[in-house]
Amino acid sequence: IKGIQSKGVAACLKHFAANNQEKNRYTVNAIIDERALREIYLKGFEIAIKESNPWSIMMAYNRLNGKYCCQNNYLINDILRKEWNYKGCIISDWGGVNDIVESINNGLNLEMPGYNDDYYKNIEQAVKNNKIKEEILDESVTKVIELILKYKESKKIPYKCNIQEHIDLAEEVAENSAVLLKNDDKLLPGNINQNIAIIGRLAKEPVIQALGSSKVNPN
């Protein structure tokens, strides 16, 4: 975190908290008692925040003790803001907000990704209907602006970017991580006159690479 931010790039600590299994992580309800939560699931975040002060932290998809993390008052306000005195920007995971009004009221600052004009009109309407207090919305906006200003200030930090060096390194990593199969018993090339059964979903929809943040452009 310190290394990244020393170069003017915001570090984002994630996924807060108890996102410790991938199966059903969008909806799973992690039931964790206070001692286990403190000693196992929160300790790493606490150390990182107190020692490195990341500019942002990302809330998890899952629920913790019945409340979605993006609208979990205990996690956001009691732990992050009050107990750990965290001053950075609190953002959602990608599409991780289930109720934007509840999320804003419980301290979420930024929902990812951005949406169309109707989305912002809904927030405006919630303010007009007193479902969101204007001062609470102001607090969220302030945290986002502070993050933007940190980025603007970081642009003054001198840097060098050797694109070709990065390309060469990526190529070297790909070459060194490739697996060469041994053609035992002359299995390949196969007999074109035989039928070969390929079983499973990936036979129809092969996953060459994952989506989202792990997707790369082979060019």
Task: Give the location of each predicted region.
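Glycoside hydrolase catalytic-domain context in secreted enzymes
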Residues: 1-219
